[in-house]
Amino acid sequence: MEEFDSKDISTSKDEDCVPLGGECHEDDINELVKEDEVDGEEETQKTKGTKRKAESILARKRKQGRLSLDQEEEEDASRESGGRIIEKEDAAAEQEKGAESEDARQEEADVLASSVSDAEPKSELPPSTQTKTGEETEETSSSNLVKVEELEKPKKAEEVKLTKSPLAGEEVRFLTQQGRLSGRTSEDEPRRSEGVQHATGEERRADTNTSSKNEAAGQKWKGQSAVDVSGDESKLRCCKEEYCIGTWNVRSMNPGKLDVVKQEMERINIDILGISELKWTGMGELNSDDHYIYYCGQQSLRRNGVALIVNKRVRNAIIGCNLKNDRMISVRFQGKPFNLTVIQVYAPTPYAEEGEVYRFYEDLQHLLEITPKIDVLFIIGDWNAKVGSQEIPGITGRFGLGMQNEAGRRLIEFCHHNRLVITNTLFQQPSRRLYTWTSPDGRYRDQIDYIICRQRWRSSVQSAKTRPGADCGSDHKLLIAKFRLKLKIIPKTTRPFRVTNEEDATNEEAKSVLKQNEKEKPEANVPSTVSSVPGGSGMTKEVGETSQEAKSVFKQDEKDKPQANVPSSVPSLPAGSGPEKCDLEKKKDCNN
């Protein structure tokens, strides 16, 4: 046998310390010992973790009543031995996963090792001692990977429970946290109201789900409105009210027809009504019961004429009016947040001269230019034009009637130039609520009356249609539209009369005289009922005075000239003869 030599033992130990044939130092040995201690601590923590898992699984199974006595003993044994069974299962699963993704982990380990080496201070050991075997490299990379994953992994949101507790007769919501790590329960946690601390993502989701359930059940918290609206949006909603605007061609307006029109306004709740073919002389304004009328016509002829009638609801919101001519008139109302301007027009017929049509659109364009761009604008009336059923984006809709004519083409060009939209072609309605004119024999129907507004205020119009039930003895139908806006009610106040110069004084005096005359004789320009003239087949006479004065004048003329109505073919007879007296009496009876 060979002799035992102690030098061989020391040499073998040194060789074990130096894997690459280098010298072995005490620092290297201490480093290896520290690594062994760290590995031991990790194994101890793993053992404790497996024990906790085993205890939790056993408690869960006991609670569910699924374990027998033998199974409980086996679980106790495995728990006492440090959860070796679970460790073996976990190790096998990890080994399988590691075999499948070894290459991927190696790449990730290299990247993470480089990042860790940059962040941590470098070791003072020589390169020879820092070199490790393949197994140690895998363990180090896996441990680094776990550490980085733990650092990068976001903290799990704390579980939240929504509870309610009565306080002073009201239901107050409190959010409590279940702190598993700190060991505190919801009872130990101090109450906090909403808004004291920032809620987590799960808190917000829980609150959203609770609010949606309350909305579905029709419940709401005390002191909260049914609709949660921001400040600006709530102001915008509360400043809008629904108003009704309309236009009607009445084919001349007498006192009896005016009463019918006012009754229809009250029945349908029309706030602003435009009138075409008024056929009144002069211009001005007058009160009629609860309605106020602005009108404009020719000076001497009872032809054309337009008017705007407003009810008492919007009377005090009027800022002023512009009596342009016998074909157009405008009235401006004060509103929130924008003012309202309404223009009533009566366009020339298709058989009118080209110069008259040109002057009409020129005057209307001038009236639009002096109207503020920010105002809510409506142009209503009888346009005597057919725009057709073809849709023109931004100008007409799909619900027009008939074929487009030359007057309709001119109207579309005017709307395109001024960015206007024809509202009563935008809404789908039955045909009887689309046409605005009917021929006397009832065979033809057309859409020639329109309510036009600016494109930017198109959404404020809620509906537009005709009312066939309204009748005032005209071949046109009443056309109305409902829109949403807030009109400001201005209280009536007496303002002092102030004059800056002589020219202003003259203008103010003229205006005061005109208003005084209109107040004294408001019905002077309204035509009375029509009387027939004998001997003029089909001829009519429009009387400006009262009917009693007209009758007295007519009788006086008959007494002065009794022979004027006797036919020339009757031969003259002696005075006092029977046939002459009989013929005159018959003629008087016929005239009466």
UniProtKB/Swiss-Prot annotation:
Tissue distribution of the protein: Expressed in liver and lung with higher expression in brain.
Organism: Bos taurus (Bovine)
GO MF, any single term: catalytic activity
Keywords: Cytoplasm, Nucleus
Note: Gene duplication of the ancestral BCNT gene leads to the h-type BCNT (CFDP1) gene and the p97BCNT (CFDP2) gene. The latter contains a region derived from the endonuclease domain of a retrotransposable element RTE-1. This repetitive sequence associated with the BCNT gene is specific to Ruminantia.
CDD domains cross-referenced by the UniProt entry: L1-EN
Pfam families with a match to the protein in the record: Exo_endo_phos (PF03372)
Residue ranges, annotated region (Disordered): 1-225, 499-592
Record's keyword annotation contains Manganese: no
Region called Hydrophilic, residue ranges: 499-578
Basic and acidic residues composition-biased segments: 1-16, 78-108, 147-162, 185-207, 508-523, 552-562, 580-592
GO CC terms of this entry: cytoplasm; nucleus
Compartment(s): Cytoplasm; Nucleus
Compositional bias segments (type: Acidic residues): 25-42
Stated name of the protein: Craniofacial development protein 2
UniProt modification remark: Phosphorylated by CK2 (casein kinase II) in vitro.
InterPro entries linked: Endo/exonu/phosph_ase_sf, Endo/exonuclease/phosphatase, Swc5/CFDP1/2
Annotated Polar residues bias: 175-184
